[in-house]
Amino acid sequence: MDANECSNSENSATTTIPKSASPSTTISTKVVKLDEIGILISQGAEAKTYETDLYGLKCIVKERFSKAYRHPILDQKISSKRILQEVRSLNKCKKKGIQVPSLYLVDIGNNRIYMEFIKGETVKHYLYKNQESTQHQNQIESIMKELGNQIGIIHEMNVIHGDLTTSNMLLRESTNELVFIDFGLSYTSNSVEDKAVDLYVLERAFISTHPNSEQLFQTILSNYELTSSNSKIVIQKLNQVRLRGRKKTCFG
């Protein structure tokens, strides 16, 4: 599903009906307020995320909200551009075999993306529970290896996630598959610097939320090298980014 195919005009929405959905069940994406039909599950700086129902199927709706300080026309253009970029990133990953939420509907007029509801826990929560458990070490190592492999493939497509943290990775309950979520800050770039910064964001997330996780991140990097053709250059640049980060921490 190309981004242009799933975008809509201000007064309509293009729908992809999930196979398991009931065709007799409908909702109006034009008039429905999500806080009336859905459950707010998170709110960030750019968007709110709801759990709701689409054609009888549980789904997640991500709704970008307007910024009062921006001119309405400019605000809509920026929101539309970011939504379409997120959709493109998800589609690229899906076509390459990366586990990401399936897209159901994109409603540009209302700044919404309807996507697959994934039942599972975040990698962050999994590590909180099991990092110190000896019986889970093999599983944790397997997850870290998969993380490195998948990020390498994502970067090989020149997709920059923009917010690589263990909160934005899920373990699907039914299969334990690793699923990447929240591509709201993603963009396309072949820059070694951008890829290195993407990895640095993940490293800082490990340092700040998962104590004694240095070896875990090293496992990620080792497996990143297996799927990224320019991994050596990216990791060299990562070392430079780390140095800049330390200087900023020391001197402000």
Swiss-Prot record:
Ranges of residues in domain Protein kinase: 35-252
Keyword Ribonucleoprotein: no
GO molecular function, one term: protein serine/threonine kinase activity
Location of region: Disordered: 1-23
BP term (GO), one: protein phosphorylation
Keywords assigned: ATP-binding, Hydrolase, Kinase, Nucleotide-binding, Nucleus, Phosphoprotein, Serine/threonine-protein kinase, Transferase, tRNA processing
GO CC term (a single one): EKC/KEOPS complex
Gene3D superfamilies named among the record's database cross-references: Phosphorylase Kinase, domain 1, Transferase(Phosphotransferase) domain 1
Positions bound to ATP: I41, S42, Q43, G44, A45, E46, A47, K48, T49, K62
Subcellular location: Nucleus
Pfam family name, one: Pkinase
Active site residues of this protein: D163
Domain of life: Eukaryota
Catalytic reactions on record: L-seryl-[protein] + ATP = O-phospho-L-seryl-[protein] + ADP + H(+); L-threonyl-[protein] + ATP = O-phospho-L-threonyl-[protein] + ADP + H(+)
Job description of the protein: Component of the EKC/KEOPS complex that is required for the formation of a threonylcarbamoyl group on adenosine at position 37 (t(6)A37) in tRNAs that read codons beginning with adenine. The complex is probably involved in the transfer of the threonylcarbamoyl moiety of threonylcarbamoyl-AMP (TC-AMP) to the N6 group of A37. Bud32 has ATPase activity in the context of the EKC/KEOPS complex and likely plays a supporting role to the catalytic subunit osgep.
UniProt record similarity statement: Belongs to the protein kinase superfamily. BUD32 family.
Miscellaneous remark of the record: This protein is considered an atypical serine/threonine kinase, because it lacks the conventional structural elements necessary for the substrate recognition as well as a lysine residue that in all other serine/threonine kinases participates in the catalytic event. Bud32 has protein kinase activity in vitro, but in the context of the EKC/KEOPS complex, the catalytic subunit osgep switches the activity of bud32 from kinase into ATPase.
Record-given protein name: EKC/KEOPS complex subunit bud32
Organism in which the protein naturally occurs: Dictyostelium discoideum
